[in-house]
Curated annotation (Swiss-Prot):
Organism of provenance: Pseudomonas paraeruginosa (strain DSM 24068 / PA7) (Pseudomonas aeruginosa (strain PA7))
Phosphoserine PTM positions: 128
Lineage start: Bacteria, Pseudomonadati, Pseudomonadota, Gammaproteobacteria, Pseudomonadales
Entry keyword annotation includes rRNA-binding: no
Region (Precorrin-2 dehydrogenase /sirohydrochlorin ferrochelatase): 1-203
InterPro entries attached to this UniProt entry: 4pyrrol_Mease, 4pyrrol_Methylase_sf, 4pyrrole_Mease_sub1, 4pyrrole_Mease_sub2, CobA/CysG_C, NAD(P)-bd_dom_sf, Siro_Cobalamin_biosynth, Sirohaem_synt_dimer_dom_sf
Protein name as catalogued: Siroheme synthase
HAMAP family the UniProt entry points to: Siroheme_synth
Catalytic activity annotation: uroporphyrinogen III + 2 S-adenosyl-L-methionine = precorrin-2 + 2 S-adenosyl-L-homocysteine + H(+); precorrin-2 + NAD(+) = sirohydrochlorin + NADH + 2 H(+); siroheme + 2 H(+) = sirohydrochlorin + Fe(2+)
A Pfam family reported for this protein in Swiss-Prot or TrEMBL: NAD_binding_7
Name of encoding gene: cysG
Amino acid sequence: MDFLPLFHSLQGRLALVVGGGEVALRKARLLADAGARLRVVAPQIHIELRHLVEQGGGELLERDYQDGDQPGCALIIAATDDEPLNAEVSRAANARGIPVNVVDAPALCSVIFPAIVDRSPLVVAVSSGGDAPVLARLIRAKLETWIPSSYGQLAGLASRFRNRVKELLPDLQQRRVFWENLFQGEIAERVLAGRPAEAERLLEERLAGGLAHMATGEVYLVGAGPGDPDLLTFRALRLMQQADVVLYDRLVAPAILELCRRDAERLYVGKRRAEHAVPQERINRLLVELASQGKRVLRLKGGDPFIFGRGGEEIDELAAHGIPFQVVPGITAASGCAAYAGIPLTHRDHAQSVRFVTGHLKDGTTDLPWKDLVAPGQTLVFYMGLVGLPVICEQLVAHGRSAQTPAALIQQGTTAQQRVFSGTLENLPQLVAEHEVHAPTLVIVGEVVQLRDKLAWFEGAREGA
């Protein structure tokens, strides 16, 4: 290890920046964020750097650097394109025992700047010792996606209650277990879900009760999207990896299910047409029962849980029993599959509105407002429309839609197995019947379908047309 990682307190202390350009500005911003008072020396100073120094009550010295600029400084930055000057600044700083950083010259540095993930008061630093700064920045970018922005609020909450917890739990091991449970439990989830006041109230109640409590479970109603794991939200992935129990349905792609916590219990509660592995009422009760046992329960649904996903029924049951829950939206099949098929759902020249419709047949027919569905200037998206496709196309034509209206059926959209069958209301049912097609599928009807010929960009499996 060439450099020892340390965090340097600069609150109210003087920091010298030699240089007045873009690079100096970037370094000065970091120093200002850390509470340093800036002294900037350069013949010409960037306008934004000038404003930064003036706002912080610092010093602007519009002239060449002088050796007498260093005394009293806690840190010195050389950020010029003059190599001899940078070397002189480094030599003088080292002679005085002042930490110095010379941009892009590790050999002249006694300290270096890491790539920083700022979730103050939580701060993560990544460094390659100056050998591969681009790699360090790439790692930082990954960390930025993995660490929720609200972790700073969570750390702040812990800081405010640290002394009280220490009084209640004088034993170090007990405190460690307490904080581990807090950072992985319901209080942390309230903060991460954007409900910090509720989290603080729960923590107050727990401390007032002398820390004796029963674990309270929670239900995460999470939309898994249309199939491609890359379309999951950060929050969905985080909750998937911490749940104790997973209830998943048929539309959740195997690749997405594999991202759940490895040791979590998995319960399949999927439904097929006229065949419910677990009735909806039983699913509702299961969610309540499991959460009442103190478990973190993931209800994982394909697409978005509030679009033909019966998510409203499930959280209504949870609310009735006082079970904490949170809902994580997912990319619904309509937007995901249409995008991957190259079909914009709205377009200035073809469709000014879009309508999501259930295509599910009951007793061989559909009870839909057909007169409204044939209005011009709209795109229709039918969920669960594979079996009812002939009826859907027939009824649209019977109520006034042209038989030549473009229409498409998408199978397993957004995945490597995606297939798209393009045709018209007149011939799409026959086209699909000539191929072996299985759910999940989505049907899109409207003039926008014809744009697929130009806009298709994602090639999945062999297409139907």
